[in-house]
Amino acid sequence: MAGSEPVSAEGESMAVDAAPRKPRILLAASGSVAAVKFANLCHCFSEWADVRAVSSSGSLHFIDRASMPKDVILYTDEDEWSSWKKLGDSVLHIELRKWADIMVIAPLSANTLGKIAGGLCDNLLTCIVRAWDYSKPFFVAPAMNTLMWNNPFTERHFISIDELGISLIPPVTKRLACGDYGNGAMAEPSTIYSTVRLFYESKAQQGRAVVTLR
């Protein structure tokens, strides 16, 4: 199993100190064909941050695990159950939540969007979301067919997750995997990476300014 290595929850906050560590980024993929780009996304982030990855069962149909960075562990639903044997053992979705400074779901499918908006937690990914500390940054990059994107439920669901403080990295208009042309394609991995990194470094700079003022 890819996720057999234990997770350390040490250093839950994004505190900036004299010798700052790398940011800890938890990347997650849900079951959209855009998950074919997930390995590329992990490579983008792993050059800058410590990365852990989570995949839903649906996303595994599209992720090329052989292309994943060697230093990035990919956790699956199987790991959630196999890592717990008895009372007192660590719970994977809690440990990953504690470990991460930032969570990014890319791609976010219509199905997983609906689950998050409704508070459902029936797999490793959605259990992490349900247990997430929303004082920490959380980004999603949706990917779905244009008609699914334009469905009235999608707007309602995004209103719900926006109230939690989850930030949207909007989809783009292009030829989709199904052959249709329209909005709903996931933003490019480079765009997702630059958005998250710019946010993190901006917050870190603000933190240093506060320390200096004190």
Curated annotation (Swiss-Prot):
Keyword line: Cell membrane, Coenzyme A biosynthesis, Decarboxylase, Flavoprotein, FMN, Growth regulation, Lyase, Membrane, Nucleus, Stress response
InterPro entries, per database record: Flavin_trans-like (IPR036551), Flavoprotein (IPR003382)
Pfam families documented for this protein: Flavoprotein
Manner of cofactor binding, per the entry note: Binds 1 FMN per subunit.
Annotated SUPFAM superfamilies: Homo-oligomeric flavin-containing Cys decarboxylases, HFCD (SSF52507)
Active site: 93 (proton donor), 178 (proton donor)
GO MF terms held by the record: FMN binding; phosphopantothenoylcysteine decarboxylase activity
Catalytic function, reaction form: N-[(R)-4-phosphopantothenoyl]-L-cysteine + H(+) = (R)-4'-phosphopantetheine + CO2
Binding, N-[(R)-4-phosphopantothenoyl]-L-cysteine: 145, 175, 177, 186
UniProt enzyme class: lyase
Triggers of expression: Induced by salt (NaCl), lithium chloride (LiCl), sorbitol, cold and abscisic acid (ABA).
Cofactor(s) this protein requires: FMN
Compartments in which it is found: Cell membrane; Nucleus
Further facts: The cv. Suxie No.1 (SX1) is more tolerant to salt stress than the cv. Tianlong No.1 (TL1).
Family in the record: Belongs to the HFCD (homooligomeric flavin containing Cys decarboxylase) superfamily.
Descriptive protein name: Phosphopantothenoylcysteine decarboxylase HAL3b
Species assigned in the record: Glycine max (Soybean)
Designated gene of the protein: HAL3B
